[in-house]
Amino acid sequence: METFKKIYKRASERKGGAKALEILLGQKIIGKKLHTDNAALQSVTALSDDRVLSAFTKQVFKSGFVWRVVEKKWSDFEESFFKFNIEKILMMPEEMLERKAADPKIIRNYNKVKTIKANAQMMFDYSLEHNTRFAQFIADWPSSNIIGLWAYLKKHGQRLGGNTGPYALRLLGKDTFILSSDVEAYLRSQKIIDGGLQSKKSLTAIQTYFNQLQQESGYTLTQLSRLIAFANGDNYIQINVVQVNDQADIKTNGAS
């Protein structure tokens, strides 16, 4: 298996140098110093549970659909579903869900609309049993076993398996890697996995490898996931960092 330094060197060469790479990894240049600006480092603790349900729902609707359409319609989703207030969602009768699923202002997919109430119920039940917000539950879960949180969401939620749950967690600011096609291809090329991507054996091996890289580097799982993707596959787009009046000006170059 490759070390962090080897992966970093290759990604840096492909992306136009270390400073450019750090920006792509989720950091920005202020003056001559690199400052962290990564969503994975933001606290999930401050979030209310309606924001968690909103993120779950957004990723459910993005799955297998055009993301920009979901983003364009999202304000209508927020309005239609009471800004994802858990108690109000749980009070919605089936007939109301059916009517809202037929509203052209949102994406008309009844099976996905039903997940809103189902996932609200999951969150409510957990909060009731443990006397804590679901957002706090997510915040407290150790990223060194992030696959365990994935498994929880898959088991207890609806349509939160695969990459849907991980993308929602990242949207919320929870540190997690994403098993994109580039990351999967890399893991297979390094013989870290050889079976099904979502099998318990594969996920355990992947978590172990990411934990090892994190111990070597101090980078977040989010950054490491991006780093592996940048170091592999066909994404050779580079950025040039030009220092102007202590600000970082970024220009994009295509590279073959």
Protein language model regions, located:
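C-terminal accessory module of base-excision DNA glycosylases/AP lyases that mediates lesion recognition
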Residues: 1-37, 131, 135, 139-256
